């Protein structure tokens, strides 16, 4: 009799994806973040579901319903902070996951990479809309500022913004639709993640050396299941330390003040994981130019497979490209810091220089490093 996991139509899919999947024997801990993202997504869907049971998407009661969750619902405070800090953990894992793809040349799997970028956009949209829901000061003004950016689109901009708002300002209609989208998008993300995996399993995983590993594969279970469980335990440990000891460290104090359209907070800024893009947006004095730079700062990832000039796939044996990669990481950290600072000297010029460096590195310096390394190989 054949094994049920190899014969049953449904179990067979799981078997080929997580049990008997041939996996390169040398993939490092940087390959753990895909499974960690899956865990983050499940955690966010579950905590979000329980929060939605008590939340009311109405401008008059949204803020107090969140307070009610924290004060009156059993373990409501924990569910709320798991959800808020879970989003931060999600983005930390995401940035590392994308960085790993950049470093080891995983972007040469075109379909997997492109779906990953669509996932990134969907995730950013979901997180932004979730930030609006507690209806604090930063929720309201963040929603106003970010949606207003679309008014920079020529001819249709103003109409588009009013259409998204459902009126002439961010109000009840906006909050209701943001809640509806925030609820449905994680399930779309789940479907996209499955597609992402489907395309990945067509080619098999990349590995740190960047060379084909068909002659040296091992089954996913038990080797990588146990490795993923260790990663998951560490993720949960860090998340619980955040939730139980420093629940508000990544949030904004302004969001504990109910939304007031009549008073603007001194510094309007998004959550920390959007600050790098916000800094790029602010570094350009022109509104349309800023919006284009903001969009391109993420869309530029689509160009990366076409900007690969090196004869080697991975950066493992390319010291010059490694320098460029870590310079890019340092630049993104600088942009994140600048995004949280007020618009004044010297932060303006630092932000502008960091933005120029960001685009220069990806479009010019990294491809150039690849060409130089190719020539060095001929010596």
UniProtKB/Swiss-Prot annotation:
It is found in: Mitochondrion inner membrane. It is a multi-pass membrane protein. One of its GO terms (molecular function) is metal ion binding. SUPFAM superfamilies: a domain/subunit of cytochrome bc1 complex (Ubiquinol-cytochrome c reductase), Transmembrane di-heme cytochromes. Its main location: mitochondrion. Keywords: Electron transport, Heme, Iron, Membrane, Metal-binding, Mitochondrion, Mitochondrion inner membrane, Respiratory chain, Transmembrane, Transmembrane helix, Transport, Ubiquinone. GO terms for cellular component: mitochondrial inner membrane; respiratory chain complex III. This is Cytochrome b. The chain crosses the membrane at residues 33-53, 77-98, 113-133, 178-198, 226-246, 288-308, 320-340, 347-367. The lineage of its organism: Eukaryota, Metazoa, Chordata, Craniata, Vertebrata. Component of the ubiquinol-cytochrome c reductase complex (complex III or cytochrome b-c1 complex) that is part of the mitochondrial respiratory chain. The b-c1 complex mediates electron transfer from ubiquinol to cytochrome c. Contributes to the generation of a proton gradient across the mitochondrial membrane that is then used for ATP synthesis. Belongs to the cytochrome b family. Heme b b566 binds at residues 97, 196. The keyword Hydrolase does not apply. Signal peptide: none annotated. Heme 1 (or BL or b562) is low-potential and absorbs at about 562 nm, and heme 2 (or BH or b566) is high-potential and absorbs at about 566 nm. Its cofactor is heme b. Binds 2 heme b groups non-covalently. Heme b b562 binds at residues 83, 182. It comes from the Eukaryota. InterPro entries: Cyt_b/b6_C (IPR005798), Cyt_b/b6_C_sf (IPR036150), Cyt_b/b6_N (IPR005797), Cytb/b6-like_sf (IPR027387), Cytochrome_b (IPR030689), Cytochrome_b_C_euk/bac (IPR048260), Cytochrome_b_N_euk/bac (IPR048259), Di-haem_cyt_TM (IPR016174). GO terms for biological process: mitochondrial electron transport, ubiquinol to cytochrome c. The cytochrome bc1 complex contains 11 subunits: 3 respiratory subunits (MT-CYB, CYC1 and UQCRFS1), 2 core proteins (UQCRC1 and UQCRC2) and 6 low-molecular weight proteins (UQCRH/QCR6, UQCRB/QCR7, UQCRQ/QCR8, UQCR10/QCR9, UQCR11/QCR10 and a cleavage product of UQCRFS1). This cytochrome bc1 complex then forms a dimer.
């Amino acid at each position: 009799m054949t094994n049920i996991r190899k014969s049953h139509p449904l179990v067979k899919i799981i078997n080929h994806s997580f049990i008997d999947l041939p996996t390169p024997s040398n993939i490092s801990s940087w390959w753990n973040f895909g499974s960690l993202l899956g865990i983050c997504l499940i955690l966010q869907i579950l905590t979000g579901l329980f929060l939605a049971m008590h939340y009311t998407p109405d401008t008059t009661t949204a803020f107090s319903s969140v307070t009610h969750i924290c004060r009156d619902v059993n373990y409501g405070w924990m569910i709320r902070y798991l959800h808020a800090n879970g989003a931060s953990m999600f983005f930390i894992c995401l940035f590392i996951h994308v960085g790993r793809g950049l470093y080891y040349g995983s972007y040469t799997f075109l379909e997997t990479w492109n779906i990953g970028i669509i996932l990134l956009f969907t995730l950013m949209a979901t997180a932004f809309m979730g930030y609006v829901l507690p209806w604090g000061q930063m929720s309201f003004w963040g929603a106003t500022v970010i949606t207003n950016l679309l008014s920079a689109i020529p001819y249709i901009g103003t109409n588009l913004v009013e259409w998204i708002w459902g009126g002439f300002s961010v109000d009840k209609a906006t909050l209701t639709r943001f809640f509806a989208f925030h609820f449905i998008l994680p399930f779309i993300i789940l479907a996209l993640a499955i597609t992402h995996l489907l395309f990945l399993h067509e080619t098999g995983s990349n590995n740190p050396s960047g060379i084909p590993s068909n002659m040296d594969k091992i089954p996913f279970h038990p080797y990588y299941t146990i490795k993923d469980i260790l990663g998951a335990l560490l993720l949960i440990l860090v998340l619980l330390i955040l939730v139980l000891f420093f629940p508000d460290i990544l949030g904004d104090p302004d969001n504990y003040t109910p939304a007031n359209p009549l008073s603007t907070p001194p510094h309007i800024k998004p959550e920390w994981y959007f600050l790098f893009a916000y800094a790029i947006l602010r570094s350009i004095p022109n509104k349309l130019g800023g919006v284009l730079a903001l969009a391109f700062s993420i869309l530029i990832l689509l160009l990366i497979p076409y900007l690969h000039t090196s004869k080697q796939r991975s950066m493992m044996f390319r010291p010059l490209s490694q320098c460029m990669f870590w310079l890019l990481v340092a630049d993104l950290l600088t942009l994140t810091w600048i995004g949280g600072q007020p618009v004044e000297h010297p932060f303006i010029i630092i932000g502008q220089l960091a933005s120029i460096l960001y685009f220069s590195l990806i479009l010019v310096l990294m491809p150039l490093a690849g060409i130089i390394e190719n020539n060095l190989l001929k010596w």
